[in-house]
Amino acid sequence: MRRSVCYVTPSVARAGQISTWRFEYSSANFLPEGTLLKFDLGIDGRPIDWEIPSTDLSQPCNTIYLETPSEDIVAAKAVYAPGGYIPTFEFTLPCDVEAGDTFSIILGSSPNFPQEDSSGNGAQLFTQRRKPFSLYVDPSGKGSFEDPDIFTMDIRGNVLKNIRIFAPSYVIKNKRFDITVRFEDEFGNLTNFSPEETHIELSYEHLRENLNWQLFIPETGFVILPNLYFNEPGIYRIQLRNQATKEVFTSAPIKCFAETSSHLLWGLLHGESERVDSEGNIESCLRYFRDDCALNFFATSSFEIQDGLTPETIKTINQTVADFNEEDRFIALSGAQYLSEEPGEGIREVLLMKEPKSPGKHKECKLFPLSKLYKQSTSHELISIPSFTASKKFGYNFNNFHPEFERVVEIYNAWGCSERTEAEGNPFPIKGSIDSENPEGTVLSALKRNLRFGFVAGGLDDRNLYNHFFDSDQQQYSPGLTAVICNKYSRDSLLEALYQRQCYATTGQRIIVNFQITSAPMGSELSTAIKPGLVINRHISGYVAGTAKIASIEIIRNEDILHTFHPDGNNFEYEYDDLSPFAQVTLKDPQNGAPFAFYYLRVTQENGAMAWSSPIWIDLN
């Protein structure tokens, strides 16, 4: 049985390329005059998707039309599904088309204007193997469409624009490690599209004289360089220099320790990819965060009440998460977001510390209050992470705080920072026509009430309550990252470190932050009963290694800035002695406990990026 022939000219596109695309269709059967055709781009309407063309042929660029075998032009009609905003395009054949004859659907310059690629139609911004386009054919002309014919096109990376270097943040002297180098276009896709003579030179601070690596861009667009090591402790950054353009690309800082060290792991406990939907394709989502973003850990964060999220989907997500979890390579966690119906109770990301499964019963979520979940759990069974706490509409007032479960709080995500208000100096306020900030939900307000939690950062979220933010003037910022300092690169060690508040938050950059008081790490609780010397002196020390020049390092005590350092560079080791009489600087505990003080570090780079260490608390006993 003869089949219709579908092909695209050109057959390969570069991500973001603007051109004229001809979808050639040679029918296996006779098509009478009046045949109805429906062309579907197969897109979701995201900014990264294929550009939607116009049916108005009076405009010179980005149009869609049909060209018959006799080269007659047929305008398209945009058709929208009920409630939809992404059109399909319909054509009615003005003449008979014999079997074997070819007509074309063209995306690009209008036929009434000069045919130039620059006035064509824009390809999607991400790579894809065999990107499908569908053509439905109804010879009756009544709209009774059956299975479509499929055009396919390969979307490849565009011109080399950026080189990203991923390396472990903590290494040990003379111990070998691997780095991954990704050659990317301006949209973050892997590419090898560059002049043939392009080669890259590798170097780093304290470079050994015998190390001189020249790299060529592989066809895959990435390369893993094994067995690097540093033979002196310190802060390093690996540099790659494009010899053709003289551009220099630098890795995030790497801290080399003299002997042993913990693991500094980067990842997301709450976030979503703009490219890959975690509910629709969890495997691709995990691969994206593991391979493209080089994260060390990722937690799913579907809302328990969400359109299209069935028990079967949850089961698939959790099984895939379990399959991807691999010690010393990638930690995958199952989590879920809980949006309370109680005023002031806010949003939680709930992580189970034991076997991954859904925290609630999907069909009964609306009847499954947070208090019931807490009553049915013990302290080491789950971690409940309040997020977006300073939101006026969806925030958390901390009135029903459970320290045994709420070990960390999300201080920042792509929709704003909850540390403090804009009037108090917050450079990333929750701001827009849909939502704004509530001072009662700020992190500092809760800390002053002697509520104790560490800091994590969330990424971008476009689901549930966040869905309408995109189509409004709601202020959006860069997705954040969470750093966790743990003993082993494993799921159990990561969750235990979160429970102990051995973590900190950044606005998305891999800034290394160390913060200690009398050698006690961030997240610690100290007492003058055990360390009487704290009454006289709180010795604060640590170091910061930025991804850019550091503008300021602020030591925060009880919401006030105790001291500010202004480093002249990307690296800085600091020491400070707080010699104020401790009894005079403590806060009163609202529950009539011991007076207390809390300290944490706030780091700001010259490029605006920030990091916040988890606090350290000191009780006056």
Swiss-Prot record:
This is Uncharacterized protein CT_425. Residues 1-15 form the signal peptide. The keyword Signal applies. The keyword Signal applies. It comes from Chlamydia trachomatis serovar D (strain ATCC VR-885 / DSM 19411 / UW-3/Cx). Belongs to the chlamydial CPn_0512/CT_425/TC_0708 family. The lineage of its organism: Bacteria, Pseudomonadati, Chlamydiota, Chlamydiia, Chlamydiales. It comes from the Bacteria. InterPro entries: DUF3604. Keywords: Signal.
